[in-house]
């Protein structure tokens, strides 16, 4: 692994490492109306989430709770209930959930098959080749996350 990792590579290492830990249940609610798919996720307090890569531009809303969000451009913001935003294609977020959080995304589509929707709307980076457990542990410590946090990817 190179001595100096890019921000994206650091997220890849972290995602790979978190994938080795026990996963947290983050229930989903899927709603379909004519021409619109709404996906709502519940994320419990204390969870570290790394999203899939979004393929489409779409609105999102924080319905309840509060989270610190790191974006690939290096920006870090705290969002809370009532926050509305637009996700751009290529976006991949890392969230630390400060309070139990409900987050919804809205997608114009007539597709209702969930497996097809996941492939249509998102992709996942290939992180299976990483062997950066030691560096990932150092990243977790620098982020102030416990040695074996509850996590989901």
Residue ranges of model-derived segments:
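C-terminal output/interaction extensions
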Residues: 110-130
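Short acidic-glycine-tyrosine-enriched beta hairpin
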Residues: 33, 40, 72-93
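Ligand-binding loop in jelly-roll beta-barrel domains
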Residues: 88-117
